[in-house]
Amino acid sequence: MSIQIIKQGIMDTLQDKGRYGFQHIGIPPCGYLDYLSAQLANVIVGNPKEAPIFELHFPASSFIFNEAHTICISGANFVPVLNDKSIALNTPIQVCKNDTLHFMQPLLGKTSYLSIKGNIDSSSWLNSKSDFSSQLKTNDQFNIIAWDGDNKINSDKTEEQASHQCNINEIQKHIFNSNEIRFIPGPQWNDLTNESISTILKQPFNTSLNSNRMGYTLKGPSLQLIEQKGYLSSAVT
């Protein structure tokens, strides 16, 4: 096997673009939680942008590589360490046989992605390899197989990939380091007082521990309604 989990994390899974078209019968689409970071990690190693990828949350899983590979880590910064050396995000990294990968602490962000050049060999269901009922466990092993048309898994394009590092850094600077969130006002927006609307637009909020794949719960200044009322639950899109 090409890669093995030597210590499981918390709710780490294998994800791809997800399975759509089955929500009407109660099957969740799953898929990347942070679509942009997952696609970026895949593209950097030369994979199709919607290829399967390891989605990690802190404390994250630890890995051992049984073969040489090209990897990339994107998304949240959990201080990735290859053997005893810290490695950069959004950068193609060459790993050797018996190298180990650990994540030390959550510095920024909630979800990180580990991409490996090649196709992660895992069972597919309804045209997707995304997990929704299981997580990565200690001693899980995965083969990494070449894509059709590739002669070998290991990348020969590290220099070419590195030449695009300036563009990657610009993406990281303008997107991943931004603390601003765009939003579309919903039906309840006009029920808020003017002071509360101003608070939302001007005051900082943090994500709470109650956040999950259905959505983020924010914690910050309290908000007030013009008129106290209750709300029925509504669809999530």
Label for each model-derived stretch:
Residues M1-T237:
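Conserved "landmark" site that anchors the functional core of diverse proteins
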